[in-house]
Amino acid sequence: MSIDTFNLFLGVMSLIALFVFIALYFVKAGYGIFRTASWGVAISNKLAWILMEAPVFVVMCVMWIYSERRFEPVIFTFFLFFQIHYFQRAFIFPLLLKGKSKMPLAIMSMGVLFNLLNGYMQGKWIFYLAPETMYQADWFTSPWFIIGTLLFFAGMLLNWQSDYIIRHLRKPGDTRHYLPQKGMYRYVTSANYFGEIVEWAGWAILTCSLSGLVFLWWTIANLVPRANAILCRYREEFGDAVGERKRVFPFLY
């Protein structure tokens, strides 16, 4: 794929993300708290998360292996950063999930498709299309890399902490919903989403790439409308207990 074709691909992905962003304010993706029978056949939540997230991990591995740049220090560092996230998301996070929740196959399939496209989008730029003079050793001391890396890992840790808080809201056998109160949940009702957005903003900055920016846009398009739906649901269930919490961005939205 030439750089011009790749840029066209990024443009198409960005337009689709815009459609998704608007649509999700009207249609709640039917997994988790919003799952309904109308979404069709569902499978184990744990299995669905593995099947949905593992493809991007595999795609990046394959693209890295076949790249002549694979052991260049900056390129290899990008690869490790990306794979740390997806190893946790595909092979650790699902096994930590509690309960017997299910995910519709339709939702899982859409997730698989996006992850395949995104794995290609990130890997194609980093391993093949980026100018050979761009990611040299001095990139490690650039403001892009330093600031982006700090944001990336801060967002990752916030996401992990927030997921931990959510997992421990219930005791074994309990199926009720609870309003999370700890950590960043004191300020927003979707702290885990805020962490993920910060993480991929860091990725876009540390790679200084359009592909990273498109991934950030997709993350926002997918998570911000859902955060809005979660806040509305919490207000219905918990009323005034929600207080002044925002949806996903502390003190803003």
For each of these PLM feature ranges, what is it?
Residues 106-125:
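Active-site pocket-lining segments that scaffold enzyme catalytic pockets across diverse folds
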Residues 131-135:
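Glycine- and acidic-residue-rich phosphate-binding/metal-coordinating active-site segment common to enzymes
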Residues 22-34, 87-91, 100, 125-130, ...:
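Juxtamembrane interfacial secondary-structure elements that flank transmembrane helices
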